[in-house]
Amino acid sequence: MVNELNVKEKMPTSGSVKKVVIFLHGYGADGADLFSLSDPLSEQLPDCFFASPDAPRKCGASPFGYEWFPIPDIDGSTIPDMMQALASSEKLIIKLIDGYKKRFGLDYSDIVLLGFSQGCMISLNIGLRQLNNLGGVVGILSLIHI
């Protein structure tokens, strides 16, 4: 199991952290994929810290990218493999959130998850089922089973 995430970070242009946005990339990508959004967003959100982790697992279908969990229909993994990896990734993301909360003296309501595709799936799962007091979840192009 991976214990830490490789994270790209950008401090706020104001120098004062009042909010955090965590980007969660899609299947087969990496943290750099969404991190480029931090430049235009920082102009509108000068007190916002941006973070973009790589998912913890190398992607079975894309040798240069990462995955939050395997997809059985794509890589031949099993549903239990997928669920175990999903739970493990969620724990790592919650650990990351808690770390920023402590580091910057923030509340959960000051932290937003922005996820694309598979990153959206895990963002919605965390935001709706585990940490429903987050500042928000922005989901782009995904789904969730309720």
Question: What are the functions of these language-model segments?
Answer:
Residues 46, 131-132:
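Proline-centered flexible-loop/turn and helix-kink motifs
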Residues 105, 128-131:
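Residue-level signal for alpha-helix termini/capping positions
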Residues 115-119, 123:
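Gly/Ala-rich beta-loop-alpha elbow adjacent to hydrolase catalytic centers
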